[in-house]
Amino acid sequence: MTRASLPVSVKAVSWSISRQPVLHNLSFEIAAGETLALLGPSGCGKSTLLKLLAGLNQPESGEIWIGDRCVASARHSLPPEARQLGMVFQDYALWPHMSVGENVAFPLRMRGVGKKPREEQARAMLARVGLEGFTARKPAALSGGQQQRVALARALVAEPAILLFDEPLSNLDRDLRETLVHSMKALLRQSGTTAVYVTHDRDEAEIIADRTLHLAQGQIVSITQSSGEPYVFSQAR
């Protein structure tokens, strides 16, 4: 990737819904090029925090910085397109009427990149995620794992400074999840992109992340370093 990755700083951020606190005074840092997993049970605030980072919600208090720029506070919030983000969702979010190549090239099209260069970049990115030759296919013809690779290629093609993942593998079976999480880790290391990876699965967090932030009831319980050792999914699931 040619665009430099950026650090992220979350400073005393809180958020509530209908006056019920969801996130409580969260503060943490993510180094440029680091992958941080957000781990915790359903309802602990993982996806809410990701939405704040993405610009889909605004903090009630505190600040979020990307690089040397405050992108969100109680007073202002930059929209997602102004934050140099790429996003990968649980449901893939592919357009069924578009080909695989058109889906991957869409962020480049929105930036005004010409047809030929964006097609070339889309083909190159599909090759990087192991889908060379899939350009003309429609998403409906692909398996779940292949669709998630297309979603990852689309997120990476515009060279984002930060990637946000919202439980991207939770709809897939165990063996496929293990294969894909190792592939995603390799791509993140190769690209050097800063990433935030939401999951409820400790195995995924241990494999893909440099560190894991453990959330419970909207508060940080701990931030742990991944072992760095070769790791496989637990047998007992």
Task: State what each model feature region is.
Residues 82, 192, 217:
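ATP/adenylate-binding site constellation spanning eukaryotic-like Ser/Thr protein kinases
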Residues 212-225:
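H-loop (His-switch) and adjacent beta-strand-loop-beta switch element
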